[in-house]
């Protein structure tokens, strides 16, 4: 983007900034520019899904902050298209690193995950289904029960593994598919969307609300290693119980299997985050259960 355009954006919103430069951490959806030391400019790619995501952010972030969630304040949102061909958003800058950049496992960052869980509880309990956020929906994933057979037919494994995975999903389906209360979800809880102070790892904020919407609260416990979930649940339950508390772990496990099988058919993704890699989540599920977790997790595992 020409520097003159960036300077015009800064001038329009009355910001006093120093150097302006493009961040090396640009994501799939947005180009990111650092406006001095205090602000971040997010400019979506010029395509309908990316533009829709930043519009969702513009209403989700104020609602989340009002509920007590730690997330950077929205300083400005401009959809006039007078300076850029797409809407854009300016946020306060969080000075830290993404948790994903630290390359630390859940066992090395338990307090971070507990804090994330607490913020999810505040989000789920504190945002009501009214006002600008009321119509926001998360992108649905297909029912995973057909995926094992599809993957077996494609040659990823054999009919034996398909029967095992199908049986596991059948065990969890009554819990996951029951009518459930709707809660406002972040929708994309990857380690790259968790901001931390690195040494020692200290939670700072959740970022990137473009996938937010209404649904089962348990689905916000996916996109991250399953080994992190017990820490998150501990932090969450210090604030509030989960909706339909007695089936929460079953629904979380269903969601992890759903995403893992959905991703498994992709080709390798060497430049993307952990949650976008085809086999990482399925291997993580196996790793979690090889660690002999206690109940209720042990009751939800279906041995081969």
Question: For each predicted feature, which ranges?
Answer:
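Short, surface-exposed alpha-helical segments at coil->helix boundaries
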Residues: 3, 58, 230-233
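Alpha-helix C-terminal capping segments
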Residues: 10-13, 32-36, 64, 176, ...
